Regions:
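Charged, cofactor-coupling segments
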Residues: 2-4, 10-93
Length: 93
C-alpha cells in the first residue's frame, strides 16, 4: 500500500505518489498538495492509517489541516529523537 497520494479533482490525484511505483519518482515541488498516510497492519486483526493532508511551501512540507495527536496513545519509547522533535513542533502549531 502506498504512503500517500496527490490531492486534486480525483480521489488519488497524480503526481505526486508516495509509493514504490514509477510515479513516486516525480519530485514533489512547491504548491503541490498531497497526503502522507502511514499505516500499521496486524495480520488477521486490524489495520490503521493516519492521513495528513499537506502541501509543499518553499521546500518544506506544511499541513493543510491541523489536528493534534492524542499523546496518551503514543508510545514515545518507540520514537527516535527526530520523530519526537517533529511531534513536539507539530503540537505547537
Amino acid at each position: 500500500h502506498g504512503l500517500g497520494h496527490g490531492i486534486g479533482v480525483s480521489v488519488h490525484e497524480y503526481p505526486p505518489n508516495l509509493s514504490k511505483n514509477e510515479m513516486a519518482k516525480i519530485e514533489i515541488k512547491d504548491n503541490m498538495c498531497f497526503t502522507i498516510e502511514p499505516g500499521l497492519y496486524n495480520e488477521k486483526h486490524f489495520g490503521i492509517r493516519l492521513e495528513n493532508s499537506c502541501y509543499m511551501k518553499k521546500g518544506k512540507i506544511t499541513s493543510l489541516v491541523h489536528m493534534n495527536y492524542e499523546k496518551k496513545l503514543i508510545d514515545f519509547s518507540m520514537l527516535n529523537e527526530q520523530e519526537k522533535e517533529w511531534l513536539n513542533e507539530f503540537e505547537v502549531l
